[in-house]
Amino acid sequence: MSKTLYQKIYDSHIVYEDKNSESILYIDLHLLHEVTSPQAFDALRNKQRKVRQSRKTFATMDHNVSTTIQNISASGSMAQKQMEQLIKNCQEFNIPLYDINNPNQGIVHVIAPEKGMTLPGMTIVCGDSHTSTHGAFGALAFGIGTSEVEHVLATQTLKQKRFKNMKIEIIGEIPKFVTAKDIILFIIGKLGSSSGTGYVIEFCGDVIKNMSMEERMTICNMAIEMGAKSGLIAPDEITYKYLKNKIYSPSGLSWEKSLDHWKFLKSDKNAYFDKCVTVDISNLAPQITWGTNPDQVISIDEKIPDYNNINSAIKRESSKSACEYMGLQSNTYLTNISIDRVFIGSCTNARIEDLRSASKILKNKKIAKHVKAIVVPGSKLVKRQAEQEGLDRIFIDAGFEWRLPGCSMCLGMNKDRLHFGGRCASXSNRNFEGRQGRGGRT
């Protein structure tokens, strides 16, 4: 029987199958951070349980960390408490931790791939919605809640129902100045922020085949913004080249055996998909969100849509509400709107390739005097590499602040926040109300 990539990974990880309900899947890699794990560890202690597979569990500090000072006390008392608790939990349960003093610390969805922890065919979970990032390697990766974090820590398994299969084929030649972020924003805008609900989405097509791993990670990172459980891209030679000689990647004979297995990880020719979509990006322009939902997106040269012309009452009201919150008017250009902040970073766009692209545009230019702009590398490895290439000097000369790694302005959970009513042009993945700070407009 022909199978999709998702079905192959799901079926190969079944520990107990219940065809009428949820099956139990084995989890290959469990990623942790300081925010969603404390309660799970407390529950383990209360039930006198141990971590089942500490070698398949990995932790880092990213959500709360300061990007200006390498000190856990720099982000406030609550953040400090969470980070101290993570240190204690990892020591007690023998879990490897990249804390802020570790030379490899960074955003969890950046460091796991760059270290070779993320491998094709794996099941990967984390208490973070953008775990779908790892699907770029042909891994079934998704976010879980705190009670599920506890369950995986205790059993290395998780109950999961089967999701439907969606295929999105991306075709055409990528126009100049268009990036992977533009492509996925366009798809979200075209299909809607709930279009992926109930599905695991496999992205394919010539455009995907020609993308780097960094670009593929951006695509899968934002599959969750369509409501999908996860995003997947079949591994290929680009994947193998990226993974070879990484610290946690297989080596020697194990590498050859892994390659043989990974080459099997693709959807069969006649595999059935519940939904198929083809997207042509040949005439695509750079995209930008104008509202408070990722599907409220337009081309940079388009006007904000007139909500009075929207047929759906729900979408019409949503657009009207977004305009009011954002302080915008229909039929106006975003290029005429003044901004207060610029943020380059997050698990969507903080890898070395992203920083190279941004630096090319900024070279020999200066930002407006009233704008505060920051660059937050996704990891210390990315930071070191960028500094070796002189990218930090380009950003600094342009007027940006060059920061330490962390989630930073992607979410208002640390000191990097947008002031009330402030506007930020952000490379992150969400533009929800208050996402970057109370009253902030992304």
Curated annotation (Swiss-Prot):
EC number: 4.2.1.33
Molecular function per GO: 3-isopropylmalate dehydratase activity; 4 iron, 4 sulfur cluster binding; metal ion binding
Residues that hold [4Fe-4S] cluster according to the record: 347, 407, 410
Required co-factors: [4Fe-4S] cluster
EC top class named in words: lyase
Co-factor binding details: Binds 1 [4Fe-4S] cluster per subunit.
UniProt superkingdom: Bacteria
One GO BP annotation of this record: L-leucine biosynthetic process
Catalytic activity annotation: (2R,3S)-3-isopropylmalate = (2S)-2-isopropylmalate
Cited InterPro entries: 3-IsopropMal_deHydase_lsu, Acnase/IPM_dHydase_lsu_aba_1/3, Acoase/IPM_deHydtase_lsu_aba, Aconitase_4Fe-4S_BS, Aconitase_4Fe-4S_dom, IPM_dehydratase_rel_enz, IPMI_cat
Keywords for the protein's UniProt record, in alphabetical order: 4Fe-4S, Amino-acid biosynthesis, Branched-chain amino acid biosynthesis, Iron, Iron-sulfur, Leucine biosynthesis, Lyase, Metal-binding, Plasmid
Coiled-coil portions: none
Pathway annotation from the record: Amino-acid biosynthesis; L-leucine biosynthesis; L-leucine from 3-methyl-2-oxobutanoate: step 2/4
Family: Belongs to the aconitase/IPM isomerase family. LeuC type 1 subfamily.
Function noted in UniProt: Catalyzes the isomerization between 2-isopropylmalate and 3-isopropylmalate, via the formation of 2-isopropylmaleate.
SUBUNIT field: Heterodimer of LeuC and LeuD.
Name this polypeptide is given: 3-isopropylmalate dehydratase large subunit
Organism: Buchnera aphidicola subsp. Uroleucon solidaginis
Taxonomic lineage from the root: Bacteria, Pseudomonadati, Pseudomonadota, Gammaproteobacteria, Enterobacterales
